[in-house]
Amino acid sequence: MTNLLEDLSFRGLIQQMTDEEGLNKQLNEEKIRLYSGFDPTADSLHIGHLLPILTLRRFQLAGHHPIALVGGATGLIGDPSGKKAERTLNTADIVSEWSQKIKNQLSRFLDFEAAENPAVIANNFDWIGKMNVIDFLRDVGKNFGINYMLAKDTVSSRIESGISYTEFSYMILQSYDFLNLYRDKNCKLQIGGSDQWGNITAGLELIRKSEEEGAKAFGLTIPLVTKADGTKFGKTEGGAIWLDKEKTSPYEFYQFWINTDDRDVVKYLKYFTFLSKEEIEAYAEKTETAPEKREAQKRLAEEVTSLVHGREALEQAINISQALFSGNIKELSAQDVKVGFKDVPSMEVDSTQELSLVDVLVQSKLSPSKRQAREDIQNGAVYINGERQTEINYTLSGEDRIENQFTVLRRGKKKYFLVTYK
């Protein structure tokens, strides 16, 4: 079996680590427990969380014991890492509800039923929530010097703009998580994004001060995902790309990966898939020699969409994509149309109402006037469910409805409009 750290290194998944030689020795000598934390700052995880989740999975596939820590307590405080301003605090009820949703999402990626090394979900509210202020200050806070904390990037980057004591203390709480998991579950490794390096090393320092001499614990950070064009990864014009299919449909999710820049696609295959080194190198060569085929992008989109949403959702996403590309809309189901044309302008009409094509083109603003609508039809620029219609006096009929629910109109190559029937 390929050495785990060598594989992570090939994939570019190691930003920094403490005591590489010691960690490598530990991983080869025993199957260790490791963790990564996920604060419930929304009701769903997004693709920015995929890298640490999939890194936990890589460790599990190598026989180690992953712990996914939901920040039921730290989510009430707010992590200042990477933030220019103070977070808005959410209520305990909301954080609790979001914690449960995130717990459910994590179960898609980690095997909690594995016979030898089942993954574990923990919630730091279970131990932080029980602490009183006196115990916290005496047992934990006394181990942290102010100068030590101010030197950490997560804090120093906020000194100018201001940071509350609440967020200032986040580092201490995360450090206590590591100490608690070290004591309670013999957890020896914390992994996180590169912006977590200061918090992770603070946790190692707390373990060193609190435990007997010779206590072994390690930290490893993974890179923050970047894009070659300089825009923020995981964001589109429509907002964040979520792992919850109700917030980002599998089709939109699939399209996000399909549209990956040639300059990024090989890196993302390494980051987000479990393809072998040989397979990835083959796709790198295909991207170099025949980028127009976009084979690497297709494989990336298939692998990640299947992983997050399952094979059935992937097949639906592919069907919608192919239908839109070929123009063969009538082959889609009503559900496919609903998903694929979610953001297209639409109007609802009575199912008994007769609609002339010219009137619909004007009402939908696909054509600015009846005269222009007639010209568009005559010139072959108007399509009903992907099929060209050249009859000026055409009236939409039941045959033009997909499952009696939708008619998709198109003018030119890209201007779509959706008619829905009630």
From Swiss-Prot:
Enzyme type, top EC level: ligase
Protein's cellular compartments: Cytoplasm
One Gene Ontology cellular component: cytosol
Domain S4 RNA-binding: residue ranges: 355-421
Residues holding L-tyrosine: Y35, Y170, Q174
Keywords: Aminoacyl-tRNA synthetase, ATP-binding, Cytoplasm, Ligase, Nucleotide-binding, Protein biosynthesis, RNA-binding
Catalytic activity: tRNA(Tyr) + L-tyrosine + ATP = L-tyrosyl-tRNA(Tyr) + AMP + diphosphate + H(+)
Subunit organization: Homodimer.
Cited NCBIfam families: tyrS
Protein name from the UniProt record: Tyrosine--tRNA ligase 1
Organism per entry: Bacillus subtilis (strain 168)
